[in-house]
Swiss-Prot record:
Signal peptide: none
SMART domains: MoCF_biosynth (SM00852)
Domain of life: Bacteria
CDD domains in alphabetical order: cinA (cd00885)
InterPro entries the UniProt entry points to: CinA, CinA-like_C, CinA_C, CinA_KH, Competence-induced_CinA, MoaB/Mog-like_dom_sf, MoaB/Mog_dom
NCBIfam families hit by this protein: cinA_nterm (TIGR00200), molyb_syn (TIGR00177), PncC_domain (TIGR00199), PRK00549.1 (NF001813)
Pfam families named among the record's database cross-references: CinA, CinA_KH, MoCF_biosynth
Gene: cinA
Family: Belongs to the CinA family.
Protein name according to UniProt: Putative competence-damage inducible protein
Length: 413
């Protein structure tokens, strides 16, 4: 089934509201095996909305509209769809009573314009709105399906999940499932080169995407049987792992910090961190993970040289000879925070995140990450690109990946 989404609302075109509905609907429809080929945003204008509907009718089997169902004069979606289809608007008494009950619950009397929300194109299947006053509806005409949904996500999502999902599932006999493989330490072009033969596979498909400092390979399989689909995905994941190897750090929703915390918990080991350029972001990422208190002993943000010297015990001679952004300082920061916290591991970050502070010898993007155990210290020098936020985020990923690799017995690049 070919589908498209028409999002109605001038506020979307002005950039006043982020269109999260289209993202949500596309994800849900993909799970039903419905291919979404087009997203259209259109303002609250009858003629332009009719143009969009005319185009959609000529290329799609399923058209979903969002927004424009409220009580005001610029809420024109149902009226425009009805006119486009040549259908009269008829009042639904049950929907009208629901509107009255909604206002009674909040101790108010509905104004007359609210009752326009109880009118629908003739023959439409009504979709109750348990979270607002604007019901949706489904219209089947000329072998096409039009589904009209409210704009607020707090109303659209429950309506879709309770009514629309099951309706569409009965209309389709295919299911789509996806799995996301997360890769760190290789660029997108390198990953694409390594898996290029797999990118031409038709079912399942493999698509490379760029995350925030990492690369994603999305496996998508389509079929009629859940077991068959799962087996296709498992087989493709196995092939990808055979090519990419230890650069794969997580699958689906799992993040790098979750992987590291789980490994620390499994091995009953503890970690302490000392941060300069990342400003506490490393500690935040770790402590965002439930159960991190069992493995995370201490976090120190030592932004100034005085803090590095007085709190962490970095030698004054080190700072004077090599500077705060140096191999030697990162090494001492990692060693000393481990001892200070009585932890198994110490992890440190020091660098120049920019946009100012760089020099020809030490440019913006220069970062050192230190990792100390009770037997050895490893320091990784990085040259990162991007703005301040990206440099900090990527530094954190590199730091966590060092811990991941050490705990898994993988060579630290």
């Amino acid at each position: 089934m070919r589908g498209e989404i028409i999002s109605v609302g001038t506020e979307l075109l002005l950039g006043q509201i982020l269109n999260t509905n289209a993202k949500y609907l596309s994800e849900k429809l993909a799970l039903l095996g419905i291919d979404i080929y087009f997203h259209t945003n259109v303002g609250d204008n009858e003629e332009r909305l009719k143009e969009c509907l005319n185009i959609a009718f000529n290329r799609s089997d399923l058209i979903i509209t969002t927004g424009g169902l409220g009580p005001t004069v610029d809420d024109i979606t149902k009226e425009t769809v009805a006119s486009f289809l040549g259908l009269p608007l008829v009042e639904n008494l049950e929907a009208k009573e629901e509107i009255i009950r909604f206002f009674e619950k909040i101790g108010q009397t509905p104004t007359m314009n609210n009752f326009k929300q109880a009118f629908f194109p003739e023959g439409a299947k009504i979709l109750p709105n348990k979270n607002g006053t604007a019901p949706g509806c489904i219209i089947e005409k000329d072998n096409k399906i039009i589904i009209i949904l409210p704009g607020p996500p707090s109303e659209l999502i429950p309506m879709f999940e309770e009514y629309v999902y099951h309706y569409l599932k009965s209309k389709t006999n295919e299911t789509i499932k996806s799995r996301v493989i997360k890769i760190f330490g290789l660029g997108e072009s390198k990953v694409e080169e390594m898996v290029r033969p797999l990118l031409f596979n038709s079912n399942p498909t493999v698509a490379p995407l760029v995350g925030d400092g990492y690369v994603i390979l999305r496996i998508t399989a389509k079929g009629h049987d859940d077991k068959e689909i799962s087996e296709m995905i498992e087989d493709m994941e196995s092939r990808i792992r055979g090519i990419i190897g230890d650069y794969i750090y997580a699958v689906d929703e799992e993040e790098m910090e979750e992987v590291v915390v789980k490994l620390l918990q499994k091995n009953k080991l503890t970690l302490a961190v000392s941060e300069s350029c990342t400003g506490g972001l490393l500690a935040k990422k770790i402590t965002d993970v439930s159960g991190a208190s069992k493995v995370f002993n201490l976090g120190v943000v030592s932004y100034s040289n005085e803090a590095k010297e007085n709190i962490l015990g970095v030698r004054k001679s080190t700072l004077e000879s090599y500077g705060a952004v140096s191999y030697e300082t990162a090494k001492e920061m990692a060693e000393n925070v481990r001892k200070l916290a009585n932890a198994d591991f110490g992890l440190s970050t020091t660098g120049i995140a920019g946009p100012t502070g760089g020099t020809p010898e030490k440019p913006v993007g220069l970062v050192y990450v230190g990792f100390a155990t009770n037997e050895e210290v490893y320091v990784k020098k990085l040259m990162l690109s991007g703005d301040r936020s990206k440099i900090r985020t990527r530094t954190v990923l590199h730091a966590l990946d060092i811990v991941r690799r050490y705990l898994l017995g993988i060579k630290i690049d």
